[in-house]
């Protein structure tokens, strides 16, 4: 038989424990059983598909497999995915023998017209489809030299022409003169001839076909510079060999320079000019001198290395 002991506190009472009749021993406390932990199933990974940016690079996936060595057109933009699956980006990349240009988002640059474009701080000169326009190019009043990968020559000298930090020739007239001399050589000499034969052929062509006018002297101000030789040489090439001894000497020097010689244009107080190369004279006077060891005595007024 069980007795229940009651504790009275003021006006109320509380039942503290069930006591047995024999000795008042409390009955054991029963701990409820806790449910066993259940494991949450891992979600099935979603396969990668389409264009994804991973860190700083882009990849294109098809059912978790990255596309490699392939062009993809995505939302109207072209991407090239290399052998490692990473899209070409931030500059030039050679694909099947052709260089193409890509921006920081890995999109091929297609300007739609011949343009100078800047990618990652580097200037490139490309055609409408974004391919390099290599070699010498005059564009918007500036002369550029473009390497095979499309980069514009910068802070370097190519063929005697200095290119500045902005990627174009520091002296446009000098650059134009160089190209004019190159074209003249191509038109008036045999492509298979030696440089000496080319020089000789061009020299005598100038002697024979110059339209001599006496009033085309450099100005006193021009004589104070060394750049007048490029101006008067270019005038000869562009105006059907029209000029006088200053233009003749300058054009002869331009041709010699293009063929690998180191010519000097000499002016004398008599109002005349001629060319000297390795101590030999090239002059339209005295029956024309080509590689002559001597000429009549003279006093040097200006000596300009072309």
Regions flagged by a language model, labelled:
Residues 1-179, 219, 267-269, 274-279, ...:
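Extracellular adhesion/carbohydrate-binding repeat motifs centered on closely spaced tryptophans
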Residues 176-237:
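Secondary-structure boundary elements
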Residues 195-200, 257-262, 280:
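Loop/turn elements at helix/coil->beta-strand transitions in domains of secreted/extracellular proteins
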Residues 208-213, 220, 270-272, 281, ...:
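Solvent-exposed loop/turn segments at secondary-structure junctions
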Residues 215-273:
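Active-site neighborhood of thiol-dependent amide/isopeptide-bond enzymes
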């Amino acid at each position: 038989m069980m007795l229940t002991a009651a504790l009275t506190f003021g006006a109320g009472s509380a039942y503290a424990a069930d006591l047995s009749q024999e000795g008042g021993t409390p009955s054991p406390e029963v701990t409820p059983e806790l449910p066993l932990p259940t494991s949450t199933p891992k979600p099935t990974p979603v396969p990668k598909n389409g264009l994804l940016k991973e860190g700083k690079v882009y990849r294109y996936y098809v059912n978790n497999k990255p596309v490699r060595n392939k062009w993809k057109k995505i939302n109207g933009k072209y991407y090239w995915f290399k052998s490692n699956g990473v899209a070409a980006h931030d500059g030039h990349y050679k694909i099947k023998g052709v260089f193409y240009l890509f921006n920081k988002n890995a999109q091929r640059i297609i300007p739609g017209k011949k343009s100078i474009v800047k990618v990652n701080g580097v200037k490139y000169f490309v055609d409408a489809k974004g391919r390099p326009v290599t070699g010498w190019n005059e564009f918007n009043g500036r002369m550029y030299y473009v390497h095979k990968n499309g980069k514009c020559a910068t802070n370097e000298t190519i063929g005697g022409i200095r290119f500045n930090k902005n990627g174009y020739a520091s002296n446009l007239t000098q650059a134009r003169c160089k190209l004019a001399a190159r074209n003249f050589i191509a038109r008036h000499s045999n492509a298979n001839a030696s440089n000496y034969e080319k020089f000789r052929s061009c020299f005598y062509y100038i002697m024979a076909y110059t339209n001599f006018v006496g009033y085309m002297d450099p100005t006193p101000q021009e004589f104070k510079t060394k750049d007048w030789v490029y101006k008067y040489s270019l005038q000869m090439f562009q105006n059907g060999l029209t000029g006088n001894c200053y233009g003749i000497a300058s054009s002869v020097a331009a041709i010699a320079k293009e063929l690998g010689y180191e010519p000097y244009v000499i002016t004398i107080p008599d109002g005349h000019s001629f060319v000297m190369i390795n101590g030999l004279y090239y002059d339209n006077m005295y029956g024309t001198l080509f590689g002559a060891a001597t000429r009549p005595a003279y006093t040097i007024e200006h000596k300009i290395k072309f």
